[in-house]
């Protein structure tokens, strides 16, 4: 929806949007708490309340001590005993604080982790139960990854120790005021009048910053979507040298984030500055008022002073609770889309379960349009009967609606009118899981999950036995290649099955459907990816499987469906004609006969080919995949140049370009920090003046109040400078690091993306989390460090000047205070890295299941996915309990030492006064300054291990940035005046992920300039590996590959790829318009060039028929287009590039016969005077090639033109032809 251009309307709309920013109530975040969580929260709350209330109790003792010490010059001996007694009370109080703070942290951390895990599972469960149409129109994989990576972490942060922290401060606030009113109500009342101003300043800051943070997060979602899509289609991006364009898009998406982040920095500076401004003015008022209370004898100096301290610190607790409130608000906003999804009403999927399934399917007056394109009518009053136990074939043009009929039977979509019936029952009223449980589906583009072959087959039947799995693999002819794998069924297939060839993926996909033993079988080009020999065997296996089952086959190759009981020609939203093969060909003017004639004309010499063959994605053509062991042994081996350490200097070098901002921020931080000890000195001076004569008290109070008023103005300025400059620096760092990481990812060779740890979901997740972590360490923590450094330096200078003896004693307790903090931090840090890795695996699983949602729901695998997801969350959940216990104990110990040290300091101060070595004034001033210092000293030094060990937390950032690609391409010569002669000379090659498996050994191939070379052979023989080597997706282990006599390793990589066009078997489109997808072939091409390319690829007519034409969005991974439409867009993209060398990997495989004929003609024109390498299973498409090479086991076993090769009747090529001809006549 585009915003209005009217500024007034825009402002009103923005204000309204800000006002109505959606969020959920805070209590709703705890919706998933069970009884055990409630017990944990109750115990944690009790601990937090006792911990918070202990501080005001401390001030009661403190007030009595002050009074004793203040009057010690009258009765020194007696005073010393009393001080010792109260100092011991401090120790008892410290023990209470130890246990209560442990309970607070341990319980809240554990319950937070437990509840967040349940929210994660509920979110994914809801996602998996949504209607498929939602994924066409509203939800992207990037959105899901962002929600699970970031948003739920924000919620987890808000429902764990942050709640304990908040209750701690609130109980301190309540207890402080209660004790204050009981002690000196007059002072408490004046203080109470100030608290609303403090709370208001904190509240406004929290509200503004939370609004900006929501906007920042929304911007990140868009950037995440771009990253996930680009990395997922990295082969296409690299083949079309689109890396810079991708980085530019990503940077554009991040620019909004940067703008909002800068505003958040300014808001934080003004917010915290205003908070301190109010505090300074409040203290000036209170010091003056307390002096009057003491003068009039309402209360003594110690009591009055500690009441004032107590009430102000209680008020301050509201300020300290403000960041927690901000976290709660942020979580409420972040949780809105999550809970909205969890509670989203899906249509009731329960229903009747039939006792027996015959398999009669009826389309009754079915009208249908896709939700994403409601203007385009696919079916209008469609009526069709699929009898039980029969094989029904659907044929017709690409985009005619064949696959849509399968989607309607699977109930991926509901008809807009009419009904789909099963055995006389409207399938809308049948239980959805039960329905899908009786249907087996094999798609044209097989979808596998990044797990083992065994697990992939078990998606068909979760409790399948080893025997059932093996039998299914035998039936699909997958067993032969699986047995050749080092790890057999336990072999990892990689993201989207990338480690396997297309034929191997399809066979596993068929095994998955077979193991299900369904009543209804839906085959959408099920044998399309197989070579002729495998196809024959698999087709026979499928024929056996089809017996007695209702089977619906979608096919472009008519030869595959000759024996179907019924063949239906789909077109124009209706069934044009139907009948058996013999019945249909008896009508020479019929649609089927017309299609048959077109196909026969395409391959007269071969009498047809039966398959819609597909070879593979352009790389892992071979039969061996990456195994878990080989990943660690080999794939990671080149990356062993990991930096063992990332120095602090290296961390800070990242912000060198922004040193001016850093300098201003450092100055602001140092001044802001140094204000606190000076403030404490002013308060201590006021306290001392309460024990002097009235005139002296008045003068001192007046002087201190004026200084505080000046300080209030300075604090606003320095806080604004500090947070604005560091905010800008932090956002610039994040922007720079994300951009560098993204560029570094795209710089890597294709082999790097084959690794299990480098899937698109995991890398997109890392881009989001790692850059933010680096910013937190380098900028956010440095801000606190510098501020507290200013505080500590100023405090020690003042303390040593005032009373060096007392300072040294207090300083001696600091190691104990700090050790607790440091231990806690180191302990937490040790868990941090491992936990983030555990979540990465879970995030990858979630992203993968959403991107393959159709396969998941078709196989009723939602529960399987959720079980796997739960297992991935088990480790962080188990660790959270131990982590919470240790963190709680260490936190409690550090609190114990802090309060015990106060008792020691006051006791020692009284001894010094007793011996006449110190005055009351110097003791109180030193003590007050050191109290403030001790409160933050632990925090400062606890940051040190984070900064020093920051390399462990962000090492992955630098690993990525420092990694040298194994295919170096930024040096070398430019390739110009390309003639196009390709030569592979003595090539030895094995994939980096499986170095033990040799693909080529002394492989030689020459493709003369301007000639076409076809590569044929069985699936997994190495055909697509040739294309991958020419494109330099991989480098050979030995031998050279030359273009026009130049070693391609000595050429600039982008220069090489600019002259090569690629069309893959599974076309990779981007989630943008058709126009933008075609334009990807040639940046800056004119509109007429784009349209001409579309016409050549036979895409213009179907594009023009769409309501939005070339502006039609193709959806994530081109899901809104049919397979044939996607392929034609991909061909148009290659046509537009107009390359000297053309690589076609089953370029016409997804097209119907009519489209294929026209596109083949277009490709023939395109191939003229151009060096072309064609990979094909279907021999009819390559009979006109200048040369044909038959590849088997990584070697060329026969080579020549079609006419020469067919003369050798016993040759491999002739055998392939006769096999396909036999299939044509006896399918």
UniProtKB/Swiss-Prot annotation:
In which domain of life is the source organism classified?
Eukaryota
InterPro entries assigned: AAA+_ATPase (IPR003593), ABC1_TM_dom (IPR011527), ABC1_TM_sf (IPR036640), ABC_transporter-like_ATP-bd (IPR003439), ABC_transporter-like_CS (IPR017871), P-loop_NTPase (IPR027417), Type_1_exporter (IPR039421)
Q: Identify the residues that the record assigns to the ABC transmembrane type-1 domain, covering every copy.
A: 41-330, 662-949
SUPFAM superfamilies associated with the record: ABC transporter transmembrane region, P-loop containing nucleoside triphosphate hydrolases
List all membrane-crossing ranges: 38-62, 90-110, 169-188, 194-214, 269-289, 297-317, 663-683, 704-724, 784-804, 806-826, 889-909, 927-947
Q: In which tissues is it expressed?
A: Expressed in the sieve elements.
Q: Where in the cell is it found?
A: Membrane
- List the GO molecular function terms: ABC-type transporter activity; ATP binding; ATP hydrolysis activity
Residues annotated to bind ATP 1: 396-403
Report domain ABC transporter positions.
361-597, 982-1218
Q: Glycosylated where? A: 758, 834
Gene Ontology CC terms: membrane; mitochondrion
List ligand-binding residues for ATP 2. Answer: 1017-1024
Keyword annotations of the record: ATP-binding, Glycoprotein, Membrane, Nucleotide-binding, Repeat, Transmembrane, Transmembrane helix, Transport
Regions annotated as coiled coil: none
Expression triggers: Regulated by the transcription factors NAC045 and NAC086.
Q: How does it sit in the membrane?
A: Multi-pass membrane protein
Spell out the family assignment given in the record's similarity comment: Belongs to the ABC transporter superfamily. ABCB family. Multidrug resistance exporter (TC 3.A.1.201) subfamily.
Q: How does it assemble?
A: Interacts with 1-naphthylphthalamic acid (NPA).
Q: Which PANTHER family match?
A: ATP-BINDING CASSETTE TRANSPORTER (PTHR43394:SF11), ATP-DEPENDENT PERMEASE MDL1, MITOCHONDRIAL (PTHR43394)
Protein name per the record: ABC transporter B family member 10
UniProt source species: Arabidopsis thaliana
Per the UniProt record, the lineage of the source organism begins with: Eukaryota, Viridiplantae, Streptophyta, Embryophyta, Tracheophyta
Gene encoding the protein: ABCB10
């Amino acid at each position: 929806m585009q915003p209005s251009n009217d500024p007034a309307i825009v402002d009103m709309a923005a204000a309204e949007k800000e006002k109505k920013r959606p969020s959920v109530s805070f209590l709703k975040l705890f919706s998933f708490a069970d009884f055990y969580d409630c017990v944990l929260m109750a115990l944690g709350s009790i601990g937090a309340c006792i911990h918070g209330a202990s501080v005001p109790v401390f001030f009661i003792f403190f007030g009595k001590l002050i009074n004793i010490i203040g009057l010690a010059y009258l009765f020194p001996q007696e005073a010393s005993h009393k001080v010792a007694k109260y100092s011991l009370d401090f120790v008892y109080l410290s023990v209470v604080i130890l246990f209560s703070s442990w309970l607070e942290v341990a319980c809240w951390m554990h319950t937070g982790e437990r509840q967040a895990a349940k929210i994660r599972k509920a979110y994914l469960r809801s996602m998996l139960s949504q209607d498929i149409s939602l994924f066409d129109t509203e939800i992207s994989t990037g959105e899901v990854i962002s929600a699970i990576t970031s948003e739920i972490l924000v919620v987890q942060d808000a429902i764990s120790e942050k709640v304990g922290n908040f209750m701690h401060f609130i109980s301190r606030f309540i207890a402080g005021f209660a004790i204050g009113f009981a002690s000196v109500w007059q002072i408490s009342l004046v203080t109470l009048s100030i608290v609303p101003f403090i709370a208001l300043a904190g509240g406004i800051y929290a509200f503004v910053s939370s609004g900006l943070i929501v906007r920042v997060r929304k911007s990140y979602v868009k950037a995440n979507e771009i990253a996930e899509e680009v990395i997922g289609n990295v082969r296409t991006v690299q083949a079309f040298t689109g890396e810079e364009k991708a980085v530019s898009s990503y940077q554009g998406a991040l620019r909004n984030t940067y703008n909002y982040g800068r505003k958040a920095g300014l808001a934080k500076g003004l917010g915290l500055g205003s908070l301190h401004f109010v505090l300074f003015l409040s203290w000036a008022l209170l010091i003056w008022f307390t002096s009057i209370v003491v003068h009039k004898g309402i209360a003594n100096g110690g009591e009055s002073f500690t009441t004032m301290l107590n009430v102000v610190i209680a008020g301050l607790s509201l300020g300290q609770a403000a960041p927690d409130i901000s976290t709660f608000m942020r979580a409420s906003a972040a949780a809105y889309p999550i809970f909205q999804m969890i509670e989203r009403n899906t249509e009731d999927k329960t229903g009747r379960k039939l006792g027996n399934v015959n398999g009669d399917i009826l389309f009754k007056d079915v009208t249908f349009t896709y939700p994403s394109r409601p203007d385009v009518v696919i079916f209008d009053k469609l009526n069709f009967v699929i009898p039980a136990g029969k094989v029904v074939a659907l044929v017709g043009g690409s985009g005619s609606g064949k696959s849509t009929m399968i989607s309607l039977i699977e109930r991926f979509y509901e008809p807009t009118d009419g009904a789909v019936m099963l055995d006389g029952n409207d399938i809308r009223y049948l239980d959805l899981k039960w329905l899908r449980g009786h249907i087996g589906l094999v798609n044209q583009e097989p979808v596998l999950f990044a797990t083992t072959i065994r697990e992939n087959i078990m998606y068909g039947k979760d409790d399948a036995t080893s025997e059932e799995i093996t039998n299914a693999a035998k039936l699909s002819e997958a067993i032969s290649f699986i047995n050749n794998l080092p790890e057999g069924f336990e072999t990892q297939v990689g993201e989207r099955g990338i480690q396997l060839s297309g034929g191997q993926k399809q066979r596993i996909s068929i095994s998955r459907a077979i193991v299900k033993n369904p009543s209804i079988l839906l085959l959408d080009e099920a044998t399309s990816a197989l070579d002729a020999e495998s196809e024959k065997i698999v087709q026979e296996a499928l024929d056996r499987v089809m017996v007695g089952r209702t089977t619906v086959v979608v096919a472009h190759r008519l030869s595959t469906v000759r024996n179907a009981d019924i063949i239906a020609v789909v077109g124009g939203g209706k069934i044009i004609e139907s009948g058996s093969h013999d019945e249909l060909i008896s009508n020479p003017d019929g649609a089927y006969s017309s299609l048959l004639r077109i196909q026969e004309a395409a391959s007269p010499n071969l009498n047809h080919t039966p398959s819609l063959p597909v070879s593979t994605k352009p790389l892992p053509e071979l039969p061996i995949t990456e195994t878990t062991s080989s990943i660690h042994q080999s794939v990671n081996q080149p990356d062993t140049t990991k930096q063992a350490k990332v120095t602090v200097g290296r961390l800070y070098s990242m912000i060198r370009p922004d040193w001016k901002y850093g300098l201003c921020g450092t100055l602001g931080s140092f001044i802001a920090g140094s204000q606190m000890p000076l403030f404490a000195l002013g308060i201590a001076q006021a306290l001392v003046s309460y024990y002097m004569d009235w005139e002296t008290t008045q003068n001192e109070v007046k002087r201190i109040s004026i200084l505080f008023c000046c300080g209030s103005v300075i604090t606003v300025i320095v806080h604004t400078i500090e947070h604005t400059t560091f905010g800008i620096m932090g956002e610039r760092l994040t922007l720079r690091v994300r951009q560098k990481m993204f560029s570094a990812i795209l710089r890597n060779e294709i082999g790097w993306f084959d690794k299990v740890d480098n899937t698109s979901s995991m890398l997109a997740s890392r881009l989001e989390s790692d850059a933010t972590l680096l910013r937190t360490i380098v900028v956010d923590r440095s801000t606190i460090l510098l501020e507290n450094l200013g505080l500590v330096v100023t405090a020690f200078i003042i303390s040593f000047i005032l009373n060096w003896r007392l300072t040294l004693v207090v300083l001696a307790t600091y190691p104990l205070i700090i050790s607790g903090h440091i231990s806690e931090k180191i302990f937490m840090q040790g868990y941090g890295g491992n936990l983030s890795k555990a979540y990465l695996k879970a995030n990858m699983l979630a992203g993968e299941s959403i991107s393959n949602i159709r396969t998941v729901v078709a196989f009723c695998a939602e529960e399987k996915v959720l079980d796997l997801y739960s297992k991935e969350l088990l480790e962080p959940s188990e660790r959270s309990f131990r982590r919470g216990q240790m963190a709680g104990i260490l936190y409690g110990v550090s609190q114990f030492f802090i309060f015990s040290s106060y008792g020691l300091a006051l006791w020692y101060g009284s001894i010094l006064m007793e011996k006449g070595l110190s005055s009351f004034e110097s003791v109180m001033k030193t003590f007050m300054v050191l109290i403030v210092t001790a409160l933050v000293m632990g925090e400062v030094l606890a940051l040190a291990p984070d900064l020093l060990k920051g390399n462990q937390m962000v090492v992955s950032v630098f690993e990525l940035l420092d990694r040298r690609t194994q295919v170096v391409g930024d040096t070398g010569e430019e390739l110009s005046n390309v003639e196009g002669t390709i030569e592979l000379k003595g090539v030895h090659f094995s994939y980096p992920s499986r170095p033990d498996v040799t693909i080529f050994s002394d492989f030689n191939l020459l493709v003369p300039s301007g000639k076409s070379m076809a590569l044929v052979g069985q699936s997994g023989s190495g055909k697509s590996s040739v294309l991958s080597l020419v494109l330099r997706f991989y480098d050979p282990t030995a031998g050279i590959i030359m273009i026009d006599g130049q070693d391609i390793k000595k050429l600039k990589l982008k220069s090489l790829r600019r002259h090569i066009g690629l069309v893959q078997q599974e076309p990779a489109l981007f989630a943008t318009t058709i126009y933008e997808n075609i334009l990807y072939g040639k940046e800056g091409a004119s509109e007429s060039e784009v349209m001409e390319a579309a016409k050549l690829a036979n895409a213009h007519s179907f594009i023009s028929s769409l309501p939005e034409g070339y502006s039609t969005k193709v959806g994530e991974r081109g899901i809104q287009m049919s397979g044939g439409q996607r392929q034609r867009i991909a061909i148009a993209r290659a046509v537009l590039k107009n390359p000297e060398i053309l690589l076609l990997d089953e370029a016409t495989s997804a097209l119907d016969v009519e489209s294929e004929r026209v596109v083949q003609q277009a490709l023939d024109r395109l191939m003229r005077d151009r060096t072309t390498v064609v990979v094909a299973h279907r021999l009819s498409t390559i009979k006109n090639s200048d040369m044909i090479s038959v590849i088997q086991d990584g070697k060329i076993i026969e080579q020549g033109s079609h006419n020469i090769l067919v003369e050798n009747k016993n040759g491999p090529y002739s055998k392939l032809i006769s096999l396909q001809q036999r299939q044509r006549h006896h399918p």
